[in-house]
């Protein structure tokens, strides 16, 4: 299982939100490229970037920062989400050196777009499913749909999606532990690999994910915990490697 540091971008800075609320953000660095360097030097093997402005505006806003990080680390798998709602945007990021694009809102509102994106950019597409009480949220979490996460995930199995990033909104940024039972249930219900996100606080939460014994869980995204020092990236990755080894 990969430990994947998150860099959330708002107005060019690296921030963390609580429960997806733009008005409840903490700025951790005004230099996201240097922040990426910190996690790379700490031994991370993949980075998770989110264009928060893009998620709300429906198109990339912090694209220059994403490109700068991708160019600095050409051999590091990088995934980007937030405002990806056209093939042109995906093409832009892929050409910039980004390994995976995360389709969120567009995947919920226009599932056929996911299949189209997978055909155009095979192996590059991840679907981001953000949920509250099992229902999918969209538009930067501002809207809660009537769509069940597991039902939607199954729809994407035939499309060639590389992974699903599952985020529990109620947990995100709160550092109260991630929703292990639902994450494991999602991984068991779909053939698509799952990346857990939201609420990871410390090594105990990583252990809980591993102890779920769900082979479909391939990664865990962590944000506030690594910024506030309750989780060490290198230590957590070493723990995962030893557990799997």
Curated annotation (Swiss-Prot):
It holds the Pfam family His_biosynth. It is found in: Cytoplasm. It catalyses: 1-(5-phospho-beta-D-ribosyl)-5-[(5-phospho-beta-D-ribosylamino)methylideneamino]imidazole-4-carboxamide = 5-[(5-phospho-1-deoxy-D-ribulos-1-ylimino)methylamino]-1-(5-phospho-beta-D-ribosyl)imidazole-4-carboxamide. Its EC number is 5.3.1.16. The active site is at residues 8, 130. Pathway: Amino-acid biosynthesis; L-histidine biosynthesis; L-histidine from 5-phospho-alpha-D-ribose 1-diphosphate: step 4/9. GO terms for cellular component: cytoplasm. GO terms for molecular function: 1-(5-phosphoribosyl)-5-[(5-phosphoribosylamino)methylideneamino]imidazole-4-carboxamide isomerase activity. Keywords: Amino-acid biosynthesis, Cytoplasm, Histidine biosynthesis, Isomerase. GO terms for biological process: L-histidine biosynthetic process; L-tryptophan biosynthetic process. InterPro entries: Aldolase_TIM, His_biosynth, HisA_bact_arch, Isoase_HisA-like, Isoase_HisA-like_bact, RibuloseP-bd_barrel. HAMAP family: HisA (MF_01014). Belongs to the HisA/HisF family. This is 1-(5-phosphoribosyl)-5-[(5-phosphoribosylamino)methylideneamino] imidazole-4-carboxamide isomerase. The lineage of its organism: Bacteria, Pseudomonadati, Pseudomonadota, Gammaproteobacteria, Pseudomonadales. The gene is hisA.
């Amino acid at each position: 299982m990969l430990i994947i540091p998150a860099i959330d971008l708002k107005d060019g800075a690296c921030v963390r939100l609580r429960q997806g609320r733009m008005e409840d953000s903490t700025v951790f660095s005004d230099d996201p490229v240097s922040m990426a360097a910190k996690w790379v030097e700490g031994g991370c093997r993949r980075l998770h970037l989110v264009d928060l402005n893009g998620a709300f505006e429906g198109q990339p806003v912090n694209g220059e920062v994403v490109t700068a990080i991708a160019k600095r680390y050409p051999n590091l798998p990088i995934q980007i989400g937030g405002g990806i709602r056209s093939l042109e945007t995906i093409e832009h990021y892929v050409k910039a050196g980004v390994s995976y694009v995360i389709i969120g809102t567009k995947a919920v509102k226009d599932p056929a777009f996911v299949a189209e994106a997978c055909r155009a950019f095979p192996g590059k597409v991840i679907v981001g499913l953000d949920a509250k009480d099992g229902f999918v949220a969209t538009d930067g979490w501002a809207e809660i749909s009537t769509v069940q996460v597991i039902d939607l995930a199954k729809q994407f199995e035939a499309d060639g999606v590389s992974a699903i990033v599952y985020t529990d909104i109620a947990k995100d940024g709160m550092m109260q532990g991630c929703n292990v039972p639902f994450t494991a249930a999602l991984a068991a219900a779909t053939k698509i690999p799952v990346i857990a996100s939201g609420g990871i606080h410390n090594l105990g939460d990583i252990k809980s994910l591993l102890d779920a014994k769900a082979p479909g869980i391939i990664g865990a995204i962590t944000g506030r915990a690594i910024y506030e020092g309750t989780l060490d990236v290198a230590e957590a990755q070493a723990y995962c490697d030893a557990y799997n080894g």
